[in-house]
């Protein structure tokens, strides 16, 4: 943030996040990513847009970023929404410059790449702009668990399981699942055993019926 180039220095989590936010379109001068409080502003925005999603433990931007962390943050950037600014202009009167700075606005995507990453939301994700042949699709694995399949053109990159909201070993009451997930209304959930569909189960408050093996 001080403008110096130190190629042999370590890269902190905050510094790397600043680079990624810049790639998403955030303007350092407008967002306060320079000066004494730059790291606070960077960390706040990075966590707000989910660049640390999937990180084990808490984000510590003062520490040097590991290779694994760098890969995770860069991967999350692919899925993050880009931003742009409107009506940025300046006028100089008698040697004094007045600048009108707008706030960051999510970039719209009205093209054919909308929906390549995540749902079709009308917003431009980083990969939808710069990696137009990269796609993720919701699928299920051999055990009917939710997963994501990544492809580049016609080539399959891989299928990866989604992280479960809750995991149990052995039997569990449907009412306990309801409580553990902080649900507010009952749900008729699809139920599979080793990939084979069973009867739907009512996940609702106080249901003592057990599922699992």
Q: What are these regions, as identified by a protein language model?
A:
Residues 1-180:
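N-terminal propeptides
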Residues 160-211:
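Long, low-hydrophobicity ectodomains and other hydrophilic envelope-associated domains
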């Amino acid at each position: 943030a001080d403008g110096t180039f130190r190629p042999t220095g370590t890269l902190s989590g905050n510094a790397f996040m600043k680079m990624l936010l810049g790639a998403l379109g955030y303007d350092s001068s407008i967002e306060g990513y320079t000066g004494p409080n730059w790291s606070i502003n960077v960390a706040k925005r990075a966590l707000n847009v989910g660049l640390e999603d999937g990180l084990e433990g808490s984000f510590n931007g003062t520490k040097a970023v590991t290779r694994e962390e760098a890969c995770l943050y860069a991967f999350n950037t692919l899925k993050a929404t880009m931003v742009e600014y409107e009506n940025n202009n300046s006028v100089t009167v008698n040697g004094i410059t007045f600048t009108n700075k707008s706030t960051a606005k999510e970039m719209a995507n009205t093209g054919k790449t909308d929906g390549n990453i995540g749902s079709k939301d009308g917003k431009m994700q980083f990969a939808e702009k710069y990696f137009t042949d990269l796609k993720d699709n919701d699928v299920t694995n051999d055990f009917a668990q939710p997963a994501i399949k990544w492809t580049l053109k016609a080539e399959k990159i891989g299928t990866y399981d989604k992280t479960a909201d809750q995991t149990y070993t052995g039997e569990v009451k449907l009412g306990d699942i309801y409580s553990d997930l902080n649900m507010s209304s009952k749900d008729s959930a699809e139920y599979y055993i080793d990939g084979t569909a069973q009867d739907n189960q009512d996940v609702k408050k106080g249901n003592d019926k057990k599922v699992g093996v």
